[in-house]
């Protein structure tokens, strides 16, 4: 019985070894084993445009807020160039075409506001002259100032003094008109400055889109070297 068990154990061992030898032969010859790449793996290089945009914005915001309109226009131009560096090619072209449609309307509005401001400023000057003259006339008659004409003193006639109430009303109206014109002119100046800033931003954006990469930088940047027309 013991010899039978030993023989059976030997048979099972031989069968097991034979199965292990036959397993590699079942692999197909035409199957290719995956090999690692022969080059060092590398991820795609990140775009440099966000860095350029941040550098441009840093340049625009390095100083204090622009005190003059020229400085404000300069910062608006820097912001537009930063926007071009941040946007992709398709968005740049969409914004460019929209800006080309809006710019003539903005310039027309700007011209109209300038004409309106000129009219209001002229009205302000006329009202200031009227207020000054009426103030002098009223003050002279109230103080009974005497004028020397050809060596003789001439006082303000009584009929002129009777005009003081009317001159006071005219002076009050001229002063009120001056205040209204000054307030309107300040509001127009703010609108004109805002439109000028928008015109500068849109023109700068379009100029940046049209700019070739050789003008923008010696290193090709994303999309700037091939502006679409």
From Swiss-Prot:
TM region(s), chain numbering: 119-139, 162-182
Topology of the protein relative to the lipid bilayer: Multi-pass membrane protein
Gene designation per UniProt: Segment-10
Annotated stretches, region: Disordered: 13-46
Organism: Bluetongue virus 11 (isolate USA)
Pfam family, one: Orbi_NS3
Protein name: Non-structural protein P8
Quaternary data: Forms homooligomers via coiled-coil motif. Interacts with host OPTN; this interaction inhibits innate immune response.
Domain of life: Viruses
GO cellular component: a single term: host cell Golgi apparatus
Record's compositionally biased regions (Low complexity): 36-46
Keyword Nucleus: no
Family: Belongs to the orbivirus NS3 family.
Basic and acidic residues compositional bias, start-end: 13-31
Keywords of this entry: Host cell membrane, Host Golgi apparatus, Host membrane, Host-virus interaction, Inhibition of host innate immune response by virus, Membrane, Transmembrane, Transmembrane helix, Viral immunoevasion
Job of this protein: Plays a role in the inhibition of host innate immune response. Interacts with host OPTN and thus inhibits the recruitment of TBK1 to the host Golgi apparatus. In turn, downstream partner IRF3 cannot be activated and IFN-beta production is impaired.
